[in-house]
Structure formats: C-alpha cells, structure tokens
Amino acid sequence: MIEIKGLYKSFDDKTVLSDINADFANGKTNLIIGQSGSGKTVLMKCIVGLLTPEKGEVLYDGRNLVLMGKKEKKMLRKEMGMIFQSAALFDSMTVFDNVMFPLNMFSNDILRDRIKRAMFCLDRVNLGEAKDKFPGEISGGMQKRVAIARAIALNPQYLFCDEPNSGLDPKTSLVIDDLIHDITQEYNMTTIINTHDMNSVLGIGEKVIYIYEGHKEWEGTKDDIFTSTNERLNNFCLLYTSDAADD
C-alpha cells in the first residue's frame, strides 16, 4: 500500500498541491485523473520521488520516502516498475534486450535465469515471437506491451503508469488497460495510473482520485462516478468522454 498524508508542493511560491491525502491499495488499479495543469503529474512525481514535497509524507508500506537517504531510495526504486507516456524503449535494442535491460542492471540472478524471466514477461504480454524485432518494426500498441513486460521484469511491488494509452486507438487502449489490470491482480501490486482517458477510468478504475487545481476534489470507484453530485468531476467526465467519442 502507498499512503499520501498532508502533501504540499510549490514552485516559485505558487502552491501546486495542497493538503493531498490518499491511499492506494495492493492488487487494485488506482487512477489519478484531472485536467492539464491540475497537479496530477506533479503528484505522481512526488509519489515516485522525482520531486520532493515541502510538507507531508509518502509512505510505501509504512516507509516514508520523503525521509529516505539516497541508498534507501535506490533500494526502493528496485521495487518499482514504470510505464511512461511514450513507451521509452531503446531503439537500438531488440524487444528482448529491452526487457533484459533492467534485469542486467539490477538483478543478481545468473544469466540463464535472467533470460528465462525476460521470456516469461514477453510471453505474458503475448510478444514472445517478437523478441528479435526492434521497436521501430512493431506497432505502438506492441511497444506499450514491451514496456509493460520491461516494467514487471524485476517483479515490482509498485507499478506506475503515466498516460499509458497516449497515442493509441480505443481498441488497443482496451488491450493495454486489461493487461495492466490483470497483471496488477496477478502480482498483487500497488498500481497507480495517471490518465485523463475516461474509457480507462470507467473500465478499470477500482479507485479514482480527481485532482482539481492542486486539491483532491473527489475520490471513489468507477461506479461511484455515475452517481456523483460533484459538479467539477461531472464536467470533467463529460468533457473527456466527449473527446473520446470524437476520436
């Protein structure tokens, strides 16, 4: 579980996050939503340790990231998997070598076991047969699946996804959503997804937090959205559902 307590973050005397409190459970897909400039990306960066809040706690199963030294943070990052808005694959490496990269960097396993793990992860995302291809030779959706395989290579406890469906068509987005959801349950990971894709929210949003102008405006489940009386949330959902329909 990841817990956020009384989180504040400012830039140049402008408060970007104000008194954010939230908890994200294991084995569930937790979604952070909000318009551009709402603070959701800053919140994600504070959670993973890329930014340091002025005040508050970020607890990883009771361990406060804010108070950790460099060595502790390095150890914690080995427990994290990350999927970026762009797949962020190495173009000069094959699909297989991309998945092997974190294993070669951080795993103490012998080479045979690292290879076995990489192939297991590729097979899990149905890309075993594409292992010798380069990123430029496969589709955008396949690249995202490679990114998922790489993210789970070290068997992380925590998975962070930044706009994982960006640039994908609705059908491919559904495949990626289902894959992230299923893997989250299989590994009992704490998964946090930063998105404004309402199809994702309504499809896999087991917990949803809506950020508005740096404040936590609303939280609930995907089903709670349909009965929400929060006008700001309702306007956001209407806007981005309409955008998805137009696409």
What is each stretch, according to the model?
Residues V48:
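Helix-to-loop junction immediately C-terminal to a conserved catalytic motif
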Residues L159-D162:
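Catalytic Walker B motif of ABC-type/P-loop ATPase nucleotide-binding domains
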Residues G56-N64:
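Conserved ABC transporter NBD signature motif
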Residues F134-I138, M142:
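Conserved ABC ATPase signature
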Residues P170-T172:
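Helix N-cap at the start of a conserved alpha-helix in ABC-type nucleotide-binding domains
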Residues A153-Q157:
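A short, proline-enriched helix->beta-strand linker immediately N-terminal to the Walker B motif
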Residues Y240-A245:
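Conserved small/polar residues in nucleotide/adenosyl-binding loops
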